[in-house]
Amino acid sequence: MRWLLLYYALCFSLSKASAHTVELNNMFGQIQSPGYPDSYPSDSEVTWNITVPDGFRIKLYFMHFNLESSYLCEYDYVKVETEDQVLATFCGRETTDTEQTPGQEVVLSPGSFMSITFRSDFSNEERFTGFDAHYMAVDVDECKEREDEELSCDHYCHNYIGGYYCSCRFGYILHTDNRTCRVECSDNLFTQRTGVITSPDFPNPYPKSSECLYTIELEEGFMVNLQFEDIFDIEDHPEVPCPYDYIKIKVGPKVLGPFCGEKAPEPISTQSHSVLILFHSDNSGENRGWRLSYRAAGNECPELQPPVHGKIEPSQAKYFFKDQVLVSCDTGYKVLKDNVEMDTFQIECLKDGTWSNKIPTCKIVDCRAPGELEHGLITFSTRNNLTTYKSEIKYSCQEPYYKMLNNNTGIYTCSAQGVWMNKVLGRSLPTCLPVCGLPKFSRKLMARIFNGRPAQKGTTPWIAMLSHLNGQPFCGGSLLGSSWIVTAAHCLHQSLDPEDPTLRDSDLLSPSDFKIILGKHWRLRSDENEQHLGVKHTTLHPQYDPNTFENDVALVELLESPVLNAFVMPICLPEGPQQEGAMVIVSGWGKQFLQRFPETLMEIEIPIVDHSTCQKAYAPLKKKVTRDMICAGEKEGGKDACAGDSGGPMVTLNRERGQWYLVGTVSWGDDCGKKDRYGVYSYIHHNKDWIQRVTGVRN
């Protein structure tokens, strides 16, 4: 029914000798000759004007065509045309040299309008059925078919049904004409002392319709010099100077240019620190653009000479405003400026052509006086005791009473950093350790002398006397290292209540209650070799038992270190367990068998007794001899430590080294020198780890 209505709307008959025009606005339709499919009338003329929306064109094709033949279509014909152009003229039944039928040919209008005219003359000798044609609107792909440069897209074209639109590459914006792509280049600021400026997209053609502004703004005192490169291509005109695209350079009120064409301008010295470069392009042209480099120039500063033993960086033939120079010195030298030493010093060329400061001098590094070494000496390798770079000194310890730890060379060199350096210790000073167990005065091992004998003065320099402040001695001890005394723990507390034999802090002697005397020989008399020292702190062995005398050992820390000499020297800690039968010497000021105190230091030589033998000797008395104890003495008695000797040293000689080692400290026994009753001593080897942990003493 729909096609029937369309057929009646488009196909109708016309009277003879009449002309008729039909206006068609649909997007598609059908056109037929009058009376189709019957023969068309003579002397007839019909025009169909087809109009579709902009962005479309009209496609026309024939399904049937049968008209009168004539030379060049003089009689009957169908003419297809636009406003100003005939697209085709058809007649006849088939194409010949002088007439053309549409056949399968499709006729396309260039625009949105097409006019189709059918005309028949006054007579037809035969029956001709006319034509049946169809038309439809088809989209125009403007992106492919647009040939007019002023209407085509600069960058990207996007077609859609009935039209198209343009877009631009990244960094560009679309002009108000909706087809031209331009750049936003009006706020380019350059502040570096050198740089390169180009037209947008250089060396590709620069965008159209652009207004670019480049500002070079340097610190006052500089002058901008411009240099265009060889590639220079800006649209120009053979008769009018730069009417289309151009560069202008503005320096203050002065304007240079315009510049265009293919010849680059000569180098330009602006004599200013502020320059504006303007670049204009119109809406046409395909030129490559331009590129220039700029460089800041300033006043020249005088030539520089490096200081003696120094250098300047960078080293240049000429220096200009804002150039900076760093002055440094050779290894072992320091920059000296206004009596201040520094690693480097920087000066700058000022805008008036002068340097910001004078070149400083280079002074040799001075390590100054080396640090004092406790118990040591310093020897300079140079005659004048120089302390400057590469000078050498040697530390040594006060022999024979001190030795250097780890046998260090003690040689230090003044380094480039201004500090004394040792290859092993770096800047740390060496350590002088007390020499132990090597008395200046040697003794002869005594044969079996009953009840001991007076000790030769200076042969026991490690012995210490524990004395009340009133001068009354009460125990002995041994010097360890430079500031510790090892003694018996029972020497440092009062007698305990037999009914409550618990050791309390209140039972302990206060450090202020007693003193230590070193270099002592006479029991009560004094001489010039003695050193009286205060007590800083006391430490009892944590497992000390005052009832059984287990771990009967204590340490006394001195307020100050004694001066080591021929009469004061520490004893060495044992390096291993003591062998049974080895001879030891016990020293002290304790009572003799006549139950009176001696005038001088006494000593006895006795052998070490087997541990099991000692245990059996005390078994009847129900007294334990534990592993932290060691026994010594004669089976027949007569030689033993006694009251007043507690805490005193029991030592032995290492014959290979000639050094004396501490074996034990006097602890307890059954009477003094009694037969089958040996002296019991606190075994130092058993407690060596604890002693070293508290004191830090090493041999």
Curated annotation (Swiss-Prot):
Protein of the plasma which is primarily expressed by liver. It holds the Pfam family Trypsin. The active site is at H490 (charge relay system), D552 (charge relay system), S646 (charge relay system). SMART domains: CCP, CUB, EGF_CA, Tryp_SPc. Changing S646A: No autoproteolytic processing. Changing F122A: Partial loss of interaction with FCN2, FCN3 and MBL2. One of its GO terms (molecular function) is calcium ion binding. Changing Y77A: Partial loss of interaction with FCN2, FCN3 and MBL2. The keyword Lyase does not apply. Residues 299-364, 365-434 form the Sushi domain. Changing Y244A: Loss of interaction with FCN2, FCN3 and MBL2. Changing E99A: Partial loss of interaction with FCN2, FCN3 and MBL2. Residues 139-182 form the EGF-like domain. It comes from the Eukaryota. Inhibited by SERPING1 and A2M. Residues 449-696 form the Peptidase S1 domain. Residues 20-184 are annotated as: Interaction with MBL2. It is found in: Secreted. Belongs to the peptidase S1 family. Homodimer. Interacts with the oligomeric lectins MBL2, FCN2 and FCN3; triggers the lectin pathway of complement through activation of C3. Interacts with SERPING1. Interacts with COLEC11; probably triggers the lectin pathway of complement. Functions in the lectin pathway of complement, which performs a key role in innate immunity by recognizing pathogens through patterns of sugar moieties and neutralizing them. The lectin pathway is triggered upon binding of mannan-binding lectin (MBL) and ficolins to sugar moieties which leads to activation of the associated proteases MASP1 and MASP2. Functions as an endopeptidase and may activate MASP2 or C2 or directly activate C3 the key component of complement reaction. Isoform 2 may have an inhibitory effect on the activation of the lectin pathway of complement or may cleave IGFBP5. This is Mannan-binding lectin serine protease 1. It comes from Homo sapiens. The lineage of its organism: Eukaryota, Metazoa, Chordata, Craniata, Vertebrata.
